[in-house]
Curated annotation (Swiss-Prot):
Chain spans, region Involved in effector-binding, probably including pyocyanine-binding: 120-270
Gene designation per UniProt: brlR
Mutant phenotype after disruption: Abolishes high-level biofilm-specific drug tolerance, including tolerance of tobramycin, norfloxacin, trimethoprim, tetracycline and kanamycin. Biofilms are more susceptible to treatment with hydrogen peroxide. Intracellular norfloxacin accumulation increases in mutant biofilms. Normal attachment, formation and architecture of biofilms. Growth in suspension, known as planktonic growth, is normal in the absence of antimicrobial agents. Increases resistance against colistin, in either planktonic or biofilm growth conditions. No differences in colony morphology or Psl polysaccharide production.
Residue span(s) of domain HTH merR-type: 1-71
Consequence of changing R86A: Reduces c-di-GMP binding. Reduces c-di-GMP binding. Drastically decreases DNA binding ability, but binding is still enhanced in the presence of c-di-GMP. Decreases DNA binding ability. Almost abolishes DNA binding ability
Xref: Pfam families: Cass2, MerR_1
Name of this chain's protein: Transcriptional regulator BrlR
Database matches in PANTHER family: MERR FAMILY REGULATORY PROTEIN, REDOX-CYCLING DRUG-SENSING TRANSCRIPTIONAL ACTIVATOR SOXR
Binding site for 3',3'-c-di-GMP 1: M1, R31, S34, D35, Y40, Y270
DNA-binding stretch(es), residue numbering of this chain: 4-23
Residues annotated for 3',3'-c-di-GMP 2 binding in this entry: M1, R31, D35, Y40
Tagged with keyword Nucleotide-binding: yes
Remaining remarks: Biofilm bacteria exhibit a profound tolerance of various antimicrobial agents, rendering biofilm cells 10- to 1,000-fold less susceptible than the same bacteria grown in a planktonic (free-floating) culture. Second messenger cyclic di-GMP (c-di-GMP) has been associated with controlling the transition between a motile and biofilm lifestyle; increased levels contribute to resistance of exponential-phase planktonic cells to tobramycin and norfloxacin.
Length: 270
């Protein structure tokens, strides 16, 4: 005979599982020691336990397995096959229902994103020229590179002296003639202050801007820029102008992945 420990090892399950099966009458030992309470099983019981565990891996409830056993279907290949076919059909219906639910969730999220973008209001401001000191990136595909630039810059931002407002940082973006862009993560700095090693000073020209407030995560900023240039400006009778646009980060920015973060997007216009 096999001990409960041997049977547990054969099937790589816990003895607690076997004790539970015994307690509910699903799989009982052939003999239980009267003096020590040890459970012993016959080798012939291995096949039945194998079927029980196979059904559990298929997410069949213990109650259903118990009914199969009591009805004799657990040891009847034909009846077990019919049960599994019904279980397969049920799973497919559940998966189909979940897929419909997931599709509805996708539509809801898309609607919320559309609502978030459609409700961006614009205000018109004119700003004089100002200087930004920070770290720069040249490239053609922003992707994760902008985030990586900020990750390198933030640990060094304390090196910048003469900040106009230490609570406000800028993400400056200037398009280059070759199609690439020049991005600077930095702070507005008064003239005359030194530029730390590895950083640059960028002069932002005086300009008229349409200012939209982006609400959402940092990766979603690209979606807001796309909406602004594709239709939001035109819907408001505004015409974009080639120049320097920038992101304005103040205390409303709670972190790059916080959906409640707010960032002002300054778009140069005529």
């Amino acid at each position: 005979m096999l001990t409960i420990g041997q049977l547990a090892r054969i099937f790589e399950i816990s003895t607690k599982t076997l004790r539970h099966y015994d307690a509910i009458g699903l799989f009982v030992p052939a003999r239980t020691g009267s003096d020590n309470g040890y459970r012993y099983y016959q080798p012939e019981q291995i096949e039945q336990l194998s079927r029980i565990l196979a059904l559990r891996r298929l997410d069949v409830p213990l109650e259903a397995i118990d009914r199969l056993k009591r009805d004799g279907a657990l040891d009847d290949p034909q009846r077990l096959r019919h049960f599994l076919q019904r279980h397969q059909h049920t799973l497919r219906e559940e998966i189909s229902a979940r897929q419909r639910l997931l599709a509805e969730l996708d539509r809801t999220l898309a609607t919320l994103a559309h609502w978030r973008i459609r409700n961006m209001h614009a205000r018109i401001v004119e700003r004089p020229a100002f200087s930004v000191v920070g770290m720069e990136y040249f490239g053609s595909a922003p992707g994760d590179t902008i985030g990586q630039l900020w990750e390198r810059f933030i640990p060094r931002e304390h090196e910048i002296a003469g900040k106009h407002d230490p609570e406000v940082s800028y993400g400056i973006c200037a398009q280059q003639p070759n199609g690439e862009f020049h991005y600077v993560a930095g702070f507005e700095v008064q003239e005359g202050w030194p530029v730390p090693e590895g950083m640059v000073r960028f002069q932002v020209p005086a300009q008229k801007y349409a200012v939209f407030t982006h609400k959402g995560t940092a990766p979603q900023i690209a979606e807001s820029f796309q909406a602004i240039y594709s239709h939001l400006l035109a819907e408001r009778g505004l015409e974009p102008k080639a120049g320097v646009d920038f992101e304005y980060y103040d205390q409303r920015f709670r972190g790059p992945l916080d959906p409640n973060s707010q960032v002002d997007l300054y778009i140069p216009i005529y």
